[in-house]
Amino acid sequence: MTNGCANGKGTIYYKNGSILYDGDFINGKYEGNGRENYENGTHYIGQFLGGYRHGKGVMYYNNGSILYEGDFVNDSIEGNGKLIQKNGNYYIGQFLNGLAHGKGVMYYKNGSVLYEGDLVNDKFQDNGKEIYENGNYYIGQFLNGYKHGKGTLYNKDGKILDKGNFANDHYSKCLIF
């Protein structure tokens, strides 16, 4: 303790006696490496700065499996990382404010690609390639998570099914402006 503030290694406990935080402190704040446990059973192991998750870290589901591994900025998932959904599908790419944002690749739980391209606020956006579980795929433009704009829908063998304009996830025979 320095001036009444924790410095060095230490542990903070919940009222019930379970550990809230175990790790490094500087001037009473989480700083350096540590583990923070949350009341819902999830926990974080990684770097802290000024009391916030900041730097490299790993978030875990309450069953102990990995939820997210990558960069944090001021307590938010931001930068590059890997997010694993409860259904086993996962995303590797860029994040902003806790959401998939920028370039990235989404995978089915079996490791095959579900989507590759641009994302904005967790939604497919601009240009990308979406591959369906039956092997068919779409290459083209997206808007708010939907096929929208110019694009081509292929079957699993590469034969064109629809080519042209798409609107709100459907092939459109009408011209889109």
Regions found by a protein language model. Name each.
Residues 1-7, 20-32, 43-54, 67-78, ...:
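Conserved anchor residues at repeat-unit boundaries in beta-strand-based tandem repeats, strongest
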Residues 172-176:
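Terminal, low-structured helical/coil segments at or just beyond the last alpha-helical repeat
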